[in-house]
Regions:
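Bacterial N-terminal signal peptides
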Residues: 8-16
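Hydrophobic alpha-helical transmembrane bundles of multi-pass membrane proteins
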Residues: 3-8, 20-328
Length: 328
């Protein structure tokens, strides 16, 4: 018992003596990595007054500071930023061009066919819009608007719209972003094969139309659009100084109307007339629907023509006025 009491007393004395020694122990030194802070990158100098004025003039003129060429580098605070005014204008124009197809063309063609074929024609217009959108997303935009050969663009550069961002599209318009430009051109790709539907109405099934459009986009539209509109296209008289044919196709006279018109004629010759044509009366289902569709096409054409200026500028205004007079 005495040994136990002595042991406990000795342990208490040792604990009491060691406590102040532990309290006075110096703290561990801070790691060297935490003490040294990473150097901050130098801040870019703000542009001076003259540069700011040049930026505003370039924005209004839809170009880059110090150059009328939209391909020049924009070395300013506005670098990598698309112009909100031009971008907003182009988004409205893109919606108007889609409005021409859905529901403009669908109602226009639906009113001209017989009652039993109205739904078929409308479904074909909607089906084409969805199909072409997928093709455009996968590789269509890349085949048309990337640099490749004079006949066709690169398959992979913008595949799945990779790299198509909100940054300015310096190949075609410095103050319109790449994604907005891509969506605007998609609406042209949608309406072009949809125009062919009217020539083969009541003579091709829905599945046959979609198969034809898929082949036609790769065989006709993508190569022709690149040759006329591509930055290194064979017939691009605007951007390609080495173009063999100096064509200026402002709003798709060649890419949209000639391609769809000639293709529709070929299809008509292959398919022949409708069964009973010239023997059985084939009255239009509804001229009211046809008239409504015509009005929608008129409205949508402002986006089609004015938007082809790729800027809210004087050229777009001139196209807007000319479209009104031509329609009247």
């Amino acid at each position: 018992m005495k040994k136990l009491i002595l042991s406990l007393t000795l342990f208490s004395l040792l604990a009491t003596t060691a406590q102040p020694l532990l309290a006075q122990a110096p703290p561990a030194p801070a790691p060297a990595a935490a003490a040294a802070k990473a150097p901050e990158p130098p801040k870019k100098a703000d542009p001076n007054v003259e540069q700011r004025i040049a930026d505003l003039e370039a924005y209004i003129g839809n170009g880059a500071r110090g150059s009328a060429d939209a391909k020049a580098n924009v070395t300013s605070k506005l670098d990598d930023v698309a112009g909100p005014g031009h971008n907003g204008f182009m988004m409205v124009c893109a919606a108007l061009v889609l409005f021409m197809t859905l529901p403009g063309l669908a109602l226009f063609y639906g009113g001209l066919v017989r009652k039993k074929n109205v739904l078929s024609v409308v479904a074909q217009c909607f089906g084409i819009a969805g199909l072409v959108t997928i093709l455009w997303f996968v590789c269509g935009y890349s085949l048309v608007f990337s640099a490749g050969s004079p006949y066709l663009g690169s398959f992979s550069k913008f595949a799945f719209l990779n790299g198509v961002t909100a940054a300015p599209n310096t190949d075609y318009s410095a103050w319109v972003s790449q994604n907005v430009f891509s969506m605007y051109q998609l609406m042209f790709a949608i309406i072009t094969p949809a125009l062919i539907v009217g020539a083969v109405a009541e003579r091709m099934k829905f599945s046959a139309i979609l198969l034809f459009v898929t082949i036609w986009m790769f065989a006709v539209y993508f190569p022709l659009a690149h040759m006329v509109w591509g930055v290194d296209g064979l017939m691009n008289g605007v951007w390609n100084g080495d173009a063999k044919i100096k064509a200026i196709d402002f709003a798709g006279g060649t890419v949209v109307h000639m391609s769809s018109g000639w293709s529709a004629l070929v299809l008509c010759l292959i398919l022949g007339p409708r069964l009973g044509h010239g023997k059985t009366p084939m009255q239009p289902h509804s001229m009211a629907l046809c008239a409504i569709g015509t009005g929608m096409l008129w409205v949508g054409w402002y986006g089609f023509n004015a938007g082809s200026a790729v800027a809210a500028d004087g050229i777009a205004g001139n196209a807007f006025m000319t479209t009104t007079l031509a329609a009247a």
